[in-house]
Design a protein with these regions (language model features):
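Residues within the DNA-recognition helix of helix-turn-helix
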Residues: 51
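Central "turn" residue of the DNA-binding helix-turn-helix
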Residues: 42-44
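Basic, amphipathic "hinge/linker" alpha-helix immediately C-terminal to the N-terminal HTH DNA-binding motif
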Residues: 66-92
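C-terminal regulatory/oligomerization modules of transcriptional regulators
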Residues: 102-140
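Residue cluster at the C-terminal edge of the helix-turn-helix DNA-binding motif
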Residues: 57-62
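Short helix-boundary/capping micro-motifs
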Residues: 28-38
Length: 140
C-alpha cells in the first residue's frame, strides 16, 4: 500500500514554505509570468501575488523578481535563491517520502485496500426510540 507525506516548513521567525508555494514558484519559472502560474494552479492573481510577497518577505534574499508591464508586458522570474529554494524543498520531500516508506511500512500494511463502507447514521428519532425500547426492557 502506498502513501504520501506532505510537508510544510514553518520558520521560527515567521513565514512558511510548502508544496503550494513551491508549485507557484515552479510555475513562475516555467511560464515567466505570475498571472500564468496562478492560472495553471487555478488561483486568483491576487492570491498568487500575496503568496509570492510572503515568500519574498520571509527570506533575506527574494525568491522572485518582477518586471513592470509595458509594450512587451511584464513578467516574473526566479532569482538564483528561488531556484535553490525549489531544489532543496523537492530534495527534502523525496528524502522524507523515502524515510516514511520504511518507517510506516507496518502501518500501511494494515490499511484497507478499499475505503470502509460508510456507517449508517442514526437519526435523533431513531435514537430516542432505541433509548425508550432499551429502558422499557422490550424489543420492537
Amino acid at each position: 500500500m502506498n502513501h504520501t507525506v506532505r510537508i510544510r516548513v514553518d520558520f521560527s521567525a515567521g513565514g512558511s514554505i510548502g508544496p503550494g508555494k513551491v508549485a507557484l514558484l515552479e510555475g513562475i519559472h516555467r511560464t515567466g509570468s505570475l498571472r500564468q502560474a496562478a492560472q495553471e494552479l487555478r488561483m486568483s492573481y491576487r492570491r498568487a501575488w500575496l503568496l509570492v510577497d510572503e515568500i519574498n518577505r520571509s527570506f533575506l534574499t527574494p525568491a522572485t523578481t518582477a518586471t513592470v508591464g509595458g509594450a512587451g508586458g511584464g513578467g516574473a522570474a526566479l532569482t538564483p535563491f528561488g531556484e535553490e529554494l525549489i531544489r532543496r524543498f523537492r530534495r527534502l520531500e523525496r528524502a522524507i517520502q523515502s524515510l516514511s516508506r520504511e518507517a510506516l511500512a507496518p502501518i500501511t500494511a494494515q490499511v484497507r485496500s478499499a475505503p470502509p463502507a460508510k456507517a449508517r447514521s442514526t437519526s435523533s428519532a431513531q435514537r430516542r426510540r432505541l433509548s425508550r425500547t432499551a429502558s422499557s426492557g422490550r424489543a420492537d
